Amino acid sequence: MTSDALTIGRYTFTSRLFVGTGKYKDLDETRRALEASGAEVVTVALRRVNLKERGEGSMMSLLQQGRVTILPNTAGCYTVEDAVRTCRLARELGLSDLVKLEVIGDERTLFPDNEATLEAARILVKEGFTVLPYCMDDPIVCRKLEDIGCAAVMPLAAPIGSGLGIRNPYNLMIIRETAKVPVIVDAGVGTASDAAVAMELGCDGVLMNTAIAGARDPILMAQAMKDAVRAGRMAYLAGRMPKKLYATASSPEQGKIAAL
């Protein structure tokens, strides 16, 4: 498994678990959860974190000490203009060109606005950003985002923060089958089995926040998610046995003891 690296644009990672930084009770819990997860990519909502504050005790200081790749995101943006402006600000403040693009279309469900996401992605790719767009689990939208030049696609498994798990595994399978860029499941994971299923379907990674931060023991859940993502990836590479309607004996007929 050491050679099974994940490459997104010019970036390469050994961990396929991406995590967020919101909803923890304090910075110490955030730090311990991040360490337990083994994640190398940590996403930060630019609207909720002061990027200029980098002194001791700040979120940015914590992330820099952890030597992780910071993935700024545009959570809370409802227009193309806001999302693009937020990404430009992140780059101006010294963060990398790697961005998680979110353009929300509905306040209640937090579903993405597909048209706005495509438009914003087109602008950002032209400006040299490595764009990872949050999108619906729609194979057509994912294909269009890939055609624009996005370095990965991030279809949701279920609404953000819902914990409902993988609601449409078949769409994710189609996306994975047709996409030539990494597919990172983003949103909806509730527990370790959800993460394992996403990876078993062939997805290249999983991004989560509430599933860890909202657990009764976030540190233990972070460890569980780390193991689940790795186990799911290994199972996908190993190839599961075919499903059958009827039983198949695991012991051969030869050598069966005859009746006395």
From Swiss-Prot:
It is an enzyme of class 2 (transferase). Keywords: Cytoplasm, Schiff base, Thiamine biosynthesis, Transferase. This is Thiazole synthase. The lineage of its organism: Bacteria, Pseudomonadati, Myxococcota, Polyangia, Polyangiales. It catalyses: [ThiS sulfur-carrier protein]-C-terminal-Gly-aminoethanethioate + 2-iminoacetate + 1-deoxy-D-xylulose 5-phosphate = [ThiS sulfur-carrier protein]-C-terminal Gly-Gly + 2-[(2R,5Z)-2-carboxy-4-methylthiazol-5(2H)-ylidene]ethyl phosphate + 2 H2O + H(+). Its main location: cytoplasm. The active site is at K100 (schiff-base intermediate with dxp). InterPro entries: Aldolase_TIM (IPR013785), Thiazole_synthase_ThiG (IPR033983), ThiG (IPR008867). Its EC number is 2.8.1.10. 1-deoxy-D-xylulose 5-phosphate binds at G161, A187, G188, N209, T210. Pfam families: ThiG. GO terms for cellular component: cytoplasm. GO terms for molecular function: thiazole synthase activity. Catalyzes the rearrangement of 1-deoxy-D-xylulose 5-phosphate (DXP) to produce the thiazole phosphate moiety of thiamine. Sulfur is provided by the thiocarboxylate moiety of the carrier protein ThiS. In vitro, sulfur can be provided by H(2)S. It comes from Sorangium cellulosum (strain So ce56) (Polyangium cellulosum (strain So ce56)). It is found in: Cytoplasm. Pathway: Cofactor biosynthesis; thiamine diphosphate biosynthesis. Signal peptide: none annotated. One of its GO terms (biological process) is thiamine diphosphate biosynthetic process.
